């Protein structure tokens, strides 16, 4: 697989899980290659109540010219998004180029999966497809020129709106970090408690084993009339 990205990617088998270290205050772009019916999944760490916009564009490999075609008419892309609880947030079929949007309602790792409808297209059968993907999270997902035109905002009002959105996103990030810290604390406490009880159990077992050995040896020596 060839790819260019701004985050660490990790393939895991045929349905690769590509881990993107994407910050919720920014946007990242990359491209990756997939084969026929192959699915690629990305893990995106997102706070709750945060809008996410994904833009993608596909290019099909021309075996004769050995180049990627600039467009792939007739080829579709299916996008599926699952929240940290495994609940499907979005599942929809798009065209060869498109945009998908969703809003997170549960903080944590969201799984974003894409695969083509290549089985319907003989030209792509057995070939490969290049997918350009750009994911925008948080206030960067807002189209401020469109907002300004719709709400008839002045430049100063628009700037104030952007600052308010940035502050809101920072608050969401802080809430999410506190949520992660709380989960980590609970996990640590649970682990420490299990370790403590295991240590106590080992100590009790050693004591009981020692008592049993002493009584067994005493019985042995008494039977041999050594004591």
Curated annotation (Swiss-Prot):
A motif (COPI vesicle coat-binding) lies at residues 220-227. GO terms for cellular component: COPII-coated ER to Golgi transport vesicle; endoplasmic reticulum; endoplasmic reticulum membrane; endoplasmic reticulum-Golgi intermediate compartment; Golgi apparatus. Residues 147-176 form a coiled coil. Keywords: Coiled coil, Endoplasmic reticulum, Glycoprotein, Membrane, Protein transport, Signal, Transmembrane, Transmembrane helix, Transport. Glycans are attached at residue 117. It is a single-pass type I membrane protein. Residues 213-227 are cytoplasmic. A motif (COPII vesicle coat-binding) lies at residues 220-221. GO terms for biological process: endoplasmic reticulum to Golgi vesicle-mediated transport; Golgi organization; intracellular protein transport; positive regulation of canonical NF-kappaB signal transduction. The keyword Repressor does not apply. Belongs to the EMP24/GP25L family. This is Transmembrane emp24 domain-containing protein 4. It comes from Homo sapiens (Human).
């Amino acid at each position: 697989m060839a790819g260019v990205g701004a985050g660490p990617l990790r393939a895991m088998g045929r349905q690769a899980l590509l881990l993107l270290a994407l910050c919720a205050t920014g946007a990242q772009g990359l491209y990756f290659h997939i084969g026929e019916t192959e699915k690629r999944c990305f893990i995106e760490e997102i706070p709750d109540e945060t809008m996410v916009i994904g833009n993608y564009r596909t290019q099909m490999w021309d075996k004769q010219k050995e180049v990627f075609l600039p467009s792939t008419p007739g080829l579709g892309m299916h996008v599926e998004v699952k929240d940290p609880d495994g609940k499907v947030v979005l599942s929809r079929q798009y065209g060869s180029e498109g945009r998908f949007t969703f809003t997170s309602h549960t903080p944590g790792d969201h799984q974003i999966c894409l695969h083509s409808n290549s089985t319907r297209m003989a030209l792509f059968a057995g070939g490969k497809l290049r997918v350009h993907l750009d994911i925008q999270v948080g206030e960067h997902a807002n189209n401020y020129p469109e907002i300004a035109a719709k709400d008839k905002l002045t430049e100063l009002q628009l700037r104030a709106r952007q600052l308010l959105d940035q502050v809101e996103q920072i608050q969401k990030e802080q809430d999410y970090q506190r949520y992660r810290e709380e989960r980590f604390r609970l996990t640590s406490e649970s682990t420490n408690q299990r370790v403590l009880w295991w240590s106590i159990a080992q100590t009790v077992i050693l004591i009981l084993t020692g008592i049993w050995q002493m009584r067994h040896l005493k019985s042995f020596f008494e039977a041999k009339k050594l004591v």
